[in-house]
């Protein structure tokens, strides 16, 4: 691990600065050390859709590591003062050859992100907002939580709106609708109490 740290260099970004923009060519892996980064894409009409939020320990840039001609398809913007560790393509590839555990972790994360991206695209295209929200809440329930879990939202509601392809006003109304129906309870600190997960999922059908 000391060898990996020796190849990385730290870069600091102020709130609102971009790590990279769509269509920029790059060959680095970015690992968030401090702060927060939002990854988003723009539609042809200029509408922004959130892809994911990166917290300390999360990474991005993995898709450009294996293709020398690849360009970024998304934007990466620091949402607060942020520091990231950057490792160049050649060094990452050497580490992956030597450390199989890192290779498996990277491939696993890439697979999950690809699946999530495909699911997100399909849901925005064909599902209602309430169904998208219900499925989003359900995806944040861990198996060991049972059928009446309390979850912590992984992002602010305005970011959930962007992620689900709708507006903050609409997402607030839908949260209110679910609460009025007795399906959830909105608690403090981004916590949501799901009264009955089965009933919640049935409501979206």
Give names to the regions the model predicted.
Residues 1, 52-111, 115:
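Cyclic-nucleotide recognition modules
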Residues 1-15, 71:
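Short proline/glycine- and basic residue-enriched helix-capping loop/turn segments at helix->loop/beta transitions
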Residues 17-80:
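Cyclic nucleotide-binding regulatory domains
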Residues 20, 33, 111, 138-142, ...:
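Short, locally clustered residues in the helix-turn-helix/winged-helix DNA-binding domain
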Residues 34, 56, 81, 89, ...:
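ATP/adenylate-binding site constellation spanning eukaryotic-like Ser/Thr protein kinases
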Residues 79-80, 97-168:
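Polybasic "coupling" helices that flank or enter modular domains
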Residues 140-205:
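Phosphate-/nucleic-acid-contacting segments
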């Amino acid at each position: 691990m000391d060898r990996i740290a020796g190849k990385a260099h730290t870069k600091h970004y102020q709130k609102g600065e971009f790590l990279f923009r769509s269509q920029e060519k790059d060959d680095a892996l970015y690992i968030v050390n401090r702060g927060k980064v939002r990854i988003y894409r723009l539609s042809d009409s200029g509408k922004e859709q959130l892809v994911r939020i990166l917290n300390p320990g999360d990474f991005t840039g993995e898709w450009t590591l294996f293709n020398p001609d690849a360009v970024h398809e998304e934007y990466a913007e620091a949402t607060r003062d942020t520091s990231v560790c950057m490792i160049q393509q050649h060094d990452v590839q050497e580490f992956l050859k030597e450390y199989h555990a890192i290779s498996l972790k990277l491939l696993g994360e890439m697979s999950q992100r690809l699946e999530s991206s495909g699911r997100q695209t399909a849901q925005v295209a064909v599902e209602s907002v309430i169904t998208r929200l219900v499925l989003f809440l359900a995806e944040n329930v861990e198996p060991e939580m049972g059928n009446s879990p309390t979850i912590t939202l992984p992002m602010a509601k305005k970011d959930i709106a962007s992620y689900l392809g709708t507006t903050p006003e609409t997402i607030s109304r839908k949260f209110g609708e679910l609460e009025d129906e007795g399906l959830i309870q909105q608690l403090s600190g981004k916590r949501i109490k799901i009264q009955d997960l089965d009933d919640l999922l049935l409501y979206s059908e």
